[in-house]
Amino acid sequence: MEYRYLGASGFRVPVLSFGTGTFGGQGALFSAWGSTDVAEARRLVDICLDAGLTMFDSADVYSKGAAEEILGEAIKGRPRDALIISTKATFRFGDGENQVGFLRAGPGVKPPVSPE
């Protein structure tokens, strides 16, 4: 797998990322894309890692959070420092004032990296 640096950030990432939009299949939009369960997600993660693809893209808005939960189960037991998990932090997740943007990020979440 070819890797490149993300802008001037010094962060080295693979040229490909695996998207988890099909994980969960909840809601009208995401059920139309697919409904990958945990067992299938584990199989897909294995295929990615065998090919050297270590970056997985998800978002809390994918299938109402189910995609992130399924990805978490699929990578459980793997060395976390060997994986890159990207997400979105600007979409509205609910109606509350703190349910949008980076304000809701927990203590284990690193600040966004700008590609510039």
Map each language-model feature to its residues:
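N-terminal binding-site loop/beta-alpha segment at the start of enzyme catalytic domains
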Residues: M1-I84, F91-F93
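Glycine/proline-rich, positively charged
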Residues: G27, W33, G96-E116
